[in-house]
Amino acid sequence: MATITAAMVKDLRETTGVGMMDCKQALTENDGDMQAAIDWLRKKGLSKAAKKAGRVAAEGLIGAVTSGNKGVVVEVNSETDFVARNEQFQGLVKMVAQVALSVGADVEVIKAAKVGSATVETAISDAIATIGENMTLRRAASLEVSKGLVASYVHNAVIDGAGKMGVIVALESSGNADELAALGRQIAMHVASSNPLAIDPSGVDPAVVKREKDILADKFRQQGKPEAMIEKITESGLKTFFKEQTLLEQPFIFDDKKSVGQALKDAEGKVGAPVKLTGFVRYALGEGIEKAESDFAAEVAAAAGQG
Protein backbone atom coordinates (compact mmCIF):
# COMPACT_ATOMS: atom_id res chain seq x y z
CA MET A 1 0.00 0.00 0.00
CA ALA A 2 1.44 3.36 -1.06
CA THR A 3 1.92 6.09 1.53
CA ILE A 4 -0.53 8.91 0.89
CA THR A 5 1.20 12.22 1.62
CA ALA A 6 -0.32 15.63 2.24
CA ALA A 7 1.36 16.88 -0.95
CA MET A 8 -0.40 14.17 -2.99
CA VAL A 9 -3.77 15.11 -1.50
CA LYS A 10 -3.05 18.79 -2.20
CA ASP A 11 -2.14 18.08 -5.84
CA LEU A 12 -5.32 16.05 -6.38
CA ARG A 13 -7.43 18.76 -4.79
CA GLU A 14 -5.87 21.45 -7.00
CA THR A 15 -6.45 19.31 -10.10
CA THR A 16 -10.07 18.36 -9.35
CA GLY A 17 -11.46 20.98 -6.98
CA VAL A 18 -12.73 18.20 -4.70
CA GLY A 19 -12.56 18.32 -0.88
CA MET A 20 -9.50 17.08 1.01
CA MET A 21 -11.16 14.04 2.61
CA ASP A 22 -12.59 12.82 -0.70
CA CYS A 23 -9.19 13.31 -2.33
CA LYS A 24 -7.49 11.32 0.42
CA GLN A 25 -10.04 8.51 0.06
CA ALA A 26 -9.61 8.48 -3.72
CA LEU A 27 -5.83 8.14 -3.38
CA THR A 28 -6.17 5.46 -0.70
CA GLU A 29 -8.63 3.44 -2.80
CA ASN A 30 -6.28 3.62 -5.78
CA ASP A 31 -2.97 2.98 -4.01
CA GLY A 32 -1.67 6.49 -4.63
CA ASP A 33 -2.21 6.44 -8.42
CA MET A 34 -3.10 10.06 -9.27
CA GLN A 35 -4.81 9.40 -12.61
CA ALA A 36 -6.78 6.45 -11.21
CA ALA A 37 -7.83 8.66 -8.28
CA ILE A 38 -9.11 11.32 -10.70
CA ASP A 39 -11.11 8.68 -12.59
CA TRP A 40 -12.46 7.31 -9.27
CA LEU A 41 -13.69 10.78 -8.26
CA ARG A 42 -15.30 11.32 -11.65
CA LYS A 43 -17.12 7.99 -11.42
CA LYS A 44 -18.45 9.15 -8.05
CA GLY A 45 -19.64 12.34 -9.72
CA LEU A 46 -17.36 14.43 -7.54
CA SER A 47 -14.99 15.79 -10.16
CA LYS A 48 -15.40 17.29 -13.61
CA ALA A 49 -11.70 17.07 -14.43
CA ALA A 50 -11.42 15.54 -17.89
CA LYS A 51 -7.75 14.70 -17.58
CA LYS A 52 -4.82 15.14 -15.28
CA ALA A 53 -3.66 18.74 -15.39
CA GLY A 54 -0.07 17.91 -14.48
CA ARG A 55 2.14 20.26 -12.57
CA VAL A 56 4.13 22.64 -14.72
CA ALA A 57 7.49 22.92 -13.06
CA ALA A 58 10.09 23.52 -15.79
CA GLU A 59 11.26 27.02 -16.66
CA GLY A 60 12.34 28.42 -20.00
CA LEU A 61 10.47 29.70 -23.04
CA ILE A 62 8.30 28.56 -25.93
CA GLY A 63 9.26 30.03 -29.30
CA ALA A 64 6.82 30.23 -32.23
CA VAL A 65 7.77 31.44 -35.71
CA THR A 66 5.84 31.39 -38.98
CA SER A 67 6.64 32.28 -42.56
CA GLY A 68 3.84 32.11 -45.09
CA ASN A 69 2.67 28.54 -45.43
CA LYS A 70 4.80 27.03 -42.66
CA GLY A 71 5.43 27.51 -38.97
CA VAL A 72 7.24 25.97 -36.01
CA VAL A 73 7.02 25.93 -32.25
CA VAL A 74 9.92 24.97 -29.96
CA GLU A 75 10.48 24.57 -26.23
CA VAL A 76 13.84 25.45 -24.68
CA ASN A 77 14.10 24.76 -20.95
CA SER A 78 16.23 26.45 -18.33
CA GLU A 79 16.56 25.78 -14.62
CA THR A 80 15.11 29.08 -13.39
CA ASP A 81 12.68 31.76 -14.51
CA PHE A 82 15.47 34.28 -13.90
CA VAL A 83 17.35 32.88 -16.90
CA ALA A 84 14.15 32.90 -18.98
CA ARG A 85 14.14 36.69 -18.50
CA ASN A 86 17.75 36.93 -19.70
CA GLU A 87 18.09 38.64 -23.11
CA GLN A 88 20.78 36.20 -24.26
CA PHE A 89 18.51 33.24 -23.49
CA GLN A 90 15.56 34.90 -25.22
CA GLY A 91 17.70 35.47 -28.30
CA LEU A 92 18.79 31.83 -28.20
CA VAL A 93 15.17 30.64 -28.20
CA LYS A 94 14.30 32.84 -31.19
CA MET A 95 17.38 31.61 -33.04
CA VAL A 96 16.45 27.97 -32.38
CA ALA A 97 12.93 28.61 -33.69
CA GLN A 98 14.26 30.27 -36.84
CA VAL A 99 16.58 27.34 -37.48
CA ALA A 100 13.69 24.90 -36.98
CA LEU A 101 11.69 26.85 -39.55
CA SER A 102 14.46 26.11 -42.06
CA VAL A 103 15.46 22.53 -41.20
CA GLY A 104 12.29 21.05 -39.71
CA ALA A 105 11.14 19.91 -36.28
CA ASP A 106 13.53 17.02 -35.57
CA VAL A 107 15.38 18.02 -32.38
CA GLU A 108 18.62 16.26 -33.33
CA VAL A 109 18.61 17.84 -36.80
CA ILE A 110 18.04 21.28 -35.25
CA LYS A 111 20.93 20.80 -32.81
CA ALA A 112 23.25 19.71 -35.64
CA ALA A 113 22.28 22.63 -37.89
CA LYS A 114 24.87 25.34 -38.51
CA VAL A 115 24.42 28.93 -37.33
CA GLY A 116 27.37 30.78 -38.79
CA SER A 117 30.43 28.62 -38.14
CA ALA A 118 28.97 26.71 -35.17
CA THR A 119 26.06 24.35 -34.60
CA VAL A 120 22.93 25.10 -32.58
CA GLU A 121 24.13 22.58 -30.01
CA THR A 122 27.38 24.53 -29.64
CA ALA A 123 25.43 27.79 -29.30
CA ILE A 124 23.41 26.23 -26.48
CA SER A 125 26.61 24.98 -24.80
CA ASP A 126 28.15 28.45 -25.09
CA ALA A 127 25.05 30.00 -23.50
CA ILE A 128 25.26 27.48 -20.65
CA ALA A 129 28.89 28.46 -20.05
CA THR A 130 28.12 32.18 -20.18
CA ILE A 131 24.91 32.22 -18.14
CA GLY A 132 25.91 29.42 -15.79
CA GLU A 133 22.74 27.35 -15.94
CA ASN A 134 21.74 24.19 -17.77
CA MET A 135 19.55 24.57 -20.86
CA THR A 136 17.99 22.02 -23.18
CA LEU A 137 16.09 22.02 -26.44
CA ARG A 138 13.27 19.77 -25.29
CA ARG A 139 10.93 19.50 -28.28
CA ALA A 140 9.81 21.04 -31.57
CA ALA A 141 6.87 20.72 -33.95
CA SER A 142 6.03 22.13 -37.37
CA LEU A 143 3.04 22.61 -39.67
CA GLU A 144 2.90 23.34 -43.39
CA VAL A 145 0.18 23.76 -46.02
CA SER A 146 0.46 23.67 -49.81
CA LYS A 147 -1.71 26.79 -50.13
CA GLY A 148 -2.81 29.07 -47.33
CA LEU A 149 -0.83 29.96 -44.23
CA VAL A 150 0.27 28.99 -40.75
CA ALA A 151 -0.66 31.49 -38.04
CA SER A 152 0.76 31.75 -34.53
CA TYR A 153 0.00 33.14 -31.10
CA VAL A 154 2.31 33.42 -28.09
CA HIS A 155 0.73 33.84 -24.67
CA ASN A 156 2.55 35.78 -21.94
CA ALA A 157 5.17 36.85 -24.48
CA VAL A 158 8.40 38.25 -23.05
CA ILE A 159 9.60 39.21 -26.53
CA ASP A 160 8.00 38.93 -29.95
CA GLY A 161 7.56 35.23 -30.71
CA ALA A 162 8.60 33.81 -27.33
CA GLY A 163 6.70 33.29 -24.08
CA LYS A 164 5.17 30.75 -21.73
CA MET A 165 2.83 29.22 -24.32
CA GLY A 166 2.93 29.02 -28.11
CA VAL A 167 0.36 27.91 -30.67
CA ILE A 168 0.56 27.41 -34.43
CA VAL A 169 -2.48 26.78 -36.62
CA ALA A 170 -2.53 25.68 -40.27
CA LEU A 171 -5.28 27.03 -42.55
CA GLU A 172 -5.59 25.75 -46.10
CA SER A 173 -7.18 28.26 -48.47
CA SER A 174 -6.59 30.19 -51.68
CA GLY A 175 -8.36 33.26 -50.30
CA ASN A 176 -7.23 36.69 -49.11
CA ALA A 177 -4.02 36.34 -47.10
CA ASP A 178 -4.71 39.24 -44.72
CA GLU A 179 -8.18 37.98 -43.80
CA LEU A 180 -6.80 34.46 -43.45
CA ALA A 181 -4.02 35.70 -41.14
CA ALA A 182 -6.51 37.52 -38.90
CA LEU A 183 -8.70 34.43 -38.73
CA GLY A 184 -5.69 32.21 -38.03
CA ARG A 185 -4.57 34.36 -35.13
CA GLN A 186 -8.05 34.19 -33.58
CA ILE A 187 -8.09 30.40 -33.94
CA ALA A 188 -4.60 30.20 -32.40
CA MET A 189 -5.75 32.33 -29.45
CA HIS A 190 -8.76 30.03 -29.06
CA VAL A 191 -6.49 26.97 -28.99
CA ALA A 192 -4.32 28.60 -26.33
CA SER A 193 -7.37 29.29 -24.18
CA SER A 194 -9.42 26.12 -24.74
CA ASN A 195 -6.69 23.47 -25.13
CA PRO A 196 -8.53 21.05 -27.47
CA LEU A 197 -7.44 17.42 -27.72
CA ALA A 198 -7.91 17.20 -31.50
CA ILE A 199 -9.43 18.98 -34.51
CA ASP A 200 -12.54 16.78 -34.49
CA PRO A 201 -13.78 13.57 -32.79
CA SER A 202 -12.03 11.34 -35.36
CA GLY A 203 -8.68 12.70 -34.16
CA VAL A 204 -9.14 11.85 -30.49
CA ASP A 205 -7.06 8.89 -29.28
CA PRO A 206 -9.38 5.82 -29.20
CA ALA A 207 -7.97 4.93 -25.77
CA VAL A 208 -9.10 8.33 -24.46
CA VAL A 209 -12.58 7.83 -25.94
CA LYS A 210 -12.85 4.34 -24.41
CA ARG A 211 -11.73 5.63 -21.02
CA GLU A 212 -14.26 8.46 -21.14
CA LYS A 213 -17.02 6.07 -22.18
CA ASP A 214 -16.18 3.66 -19.33
CA ILE A 215 -16.16 6.51 -16.79
CA LEU A 216 -19.55 7.76 -17.99
CA ALA A 217 -21.08 4.27 -17.96
CA ASP A 218 -19.81 3.57 -14.43
CA LYS A 219 -21.08 6.94 -13.25
CA PHE A 220 -24.58 6.31 -14.63
CA ARG A 221 -24.66 2.81 -13.10
CA GLN A 222 -23.79 4.27 -9.71
CA GLN A 223 -26.64 6.75 -10.18
CA GLY A 224 -29.00 3.80 -10.60
CA LYS A 225 -29.77 4.29 -14.30
CA PRO A 226 -31.34 1.23 -15.99
CA GLU A 227 -28.78 -0.88 -17.87
CA ALA A 228 -30.91 -0.65 -21.03
CA MET A 229 -30.52 3.14 -20.99
CA ILE A 230 -26.82 3.32 -20.20
CA GLU A 231 -25.53 2.88 -23.75
CA LYS A 232 -27.78 5.65 -25.06
CA ILE A 233 -27.04 8.18 -22.32
CA THR A 234 -23.34 7.33 -22.47
CA GLU A 235 -23.30 8.18 -26.19
CA SER A 236 -25.03 11.46 -25.32
CA GLY A 237 -22.35 12.11 -22.71
CA LEU A 238 -19.64 11.45 -25.29
CA LYS A 239 -21.17 14.09 -27.58
CA THR A 240 -20.81 16.59 -24.74
CA PHE A 241 -17.21 15.45 -24.22
CA PHE A 242 -16.38 15.98 -27.91
CA LYS A 243 -18.05 19.40 -27.86
CA GLU A 244 -15.82 20.39 -24.96
CA GLN A 245 -12.60 18.75 -26.15
CA THR A 246 -12.42 18.97 -29.98
CA LEU A 247 -11.51 22.21 -31.71
CA LEU A 248 -14.15 22.44 -34.43
CA GLU A 249 -16.96 21.66 -31.96
CA GLN A 250 -15.84 23.96 -29.14
CA PRO A 251 -17.73 27.25 -28.63
CA PHE A 252 -15.61 29.95 -30.28
CA ILE A 253 -14.12 32.24 -27.62
CA PHE A 254 -14.75 35.33 -29.78
CA ASP A 255 -18.44 34.42 -30.27
CA ASP A 256 -19.64 31.57 -28.08
CA LYS A 257 -22.98 31.42 -29.90
CA LYS A 258 -21.18 29.54 -32.67
CA SER A 259 -18.65 26.71 -32.79
CA VAL A 260 -15.14 27.12 -34.18
CA GLY A 261 -16.27 25.10 -37.19
CA GLN A 262 -19.15 27.50 -37.79
CA ALA A 263 -16.83 30.49 -37.33
CA LEU A 264 -14.52 29.09 -40.02
CA LYS A 265 -17.45 28.60 -42.38
CA ASP A 266 -18.76 32.11 -41.73
CA ALA A 267 -15.30 33.59 -42.37
CA GLU A 268 -15.15 32.16 -45.88
CA GLY A 269 -17.13 35.17 -47.16
CA LYS A 270 -14.43 37.61 -46.04
CA VAL A 271 -11.60 35.30 -47.07
CA GLY A 272 -13.19 34.80 -50.48
CA ALA A 273 -12.57 31.05 -50.66
CA PRO A 274 -13.16 27.84 -48.67
CA VAL A 275 -11.05 27.51 -45.50
CA LYS A 276 -9.92 24.20 -44.03
CA LEU A 277 -8.16 23.88 -40.68
CA THR A 278 -5.59 21.14 -41.25
CA GLY A 279 -3.63 21.15 -37.99
CA PHE A 280 -2.66 22.86 -34.78
CA VAL A 281 0.09 22.55 -32.17
CA ARG A 282 -0.13 23.97 -28.65
CA TYR A 283 2.95 23.98 -26.42
CA ALA A 284 2.66 25.07 -22.79
CA LEU A 285 5.94 25.46 -20.94
CA GLY A 286 6.89 22.40 -18.92
CA GLU A 287 3.99 20.15 -19.91
CA GLY A 288 4.66 16.67 -18.58
CA ILE A 289 7.75 17.72 -16.62
CA GLU A 290 7.42 17.29 -12.88
CA LYS A 291 10.02 18.70 -10.54
CA ALA A 292 10.12 17.69 -6.89
CA GLU A 293 9.00 20.45 -4.55
CA SER A 294 11.61 21.22 -1.95
CA ASP A 295 10.95 21.40 1.78
CA PHE A 296 12.24 24.92 2.43
CA ALA A 297 12.35 24.52 6.23
CA ALA A 298 14.32 21.28 5.89
CA GLU A 299 16.76 22.94 3.48
CA VAL A 300 17.35 25.84 5.90
CA ALA A 301 17.86 23.41 8.79
CA ALA A 302 20.29 21.34 6.73
CA ALA A 303 22.22 24.45 5.69
CA ALA A 304 22.47 25.44 9.36
CA GLY A 305 23.81 21.98 10.24
CA GLN A 306 20.64 20.96 12.04
CA GLY A 307 19.40 18.34 9.57
Curated annotation (Swiss-Prot):
Assigned keywords, A-Z: Cytoplasm, Elongation factor, Protein biosynthesis
Chain segments carrying region Involved in Mg(2+) ion dislocation from EF-Tu? 80-83
- Keyword Protein biosynthesis present in the record's keywords: the answer is yes
Q: GO cellular component annotations, sorted alphabetically?
A: cytoplasm
PROSITE patterns under this entry?
Answer: EF_TS_1, EF_TS_2
GO molecular function, a single term: translation elongation factor activity
**What is the protein name for this chain?**
Elongation factor Ts
Source organism? Nitrobacter hamburgensis (strain DSM 10229 / NCIMB 13809 / X14)
